[in-house]
Amino acid sequence: MLEAGPLRLDPATREVERDGREIELSAREFALLEAFMRRPGQVLTQGQLLEAAWDAGYEQRSNVVEVYVRYVREKIDRPFGAEGIETVRGVGYRLRKDGGGA
């Protein structure tokens, strides 16, 4: 079980919840969130996120990482009035260690 504040992710059952409420994620969204939750507080580059959630030979030619990070934010942050995933301009993204607050 991975935890960051009120956010919980179980890699074995592929379940995600925040404040006790289950959150449905696609396989790719789950892979992105798992990458963040394995390294809370650490900045992950777009390359690292691509490696975590896309096939090895995938070449980024668009804003696909930005789009999927937005999808994850819309599911784990917005409904709860939280800001767990932060943009670090020019570098990448980071999941706050507190998961965006209690």
Q: Where do the language-model regions lie?
A:
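Basic, amphipathic DNA-recognition helix from helix-turn-helix-like DNA-binding domains
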Residues: M1-E3
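C-terminal end segment of the histidine kinase catalytic
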Residues: K97-A102
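Short, surface-exposed charged micro-motifs
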Residues: P6-R8, G84
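A short, compositionally biased
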Residues: L9-E15
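Positively charged, aromatic-enriched patches within helix-turn-helix-type DNA-binding elements
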Residues: E15, G20-A27, A31-G84, R89-V91
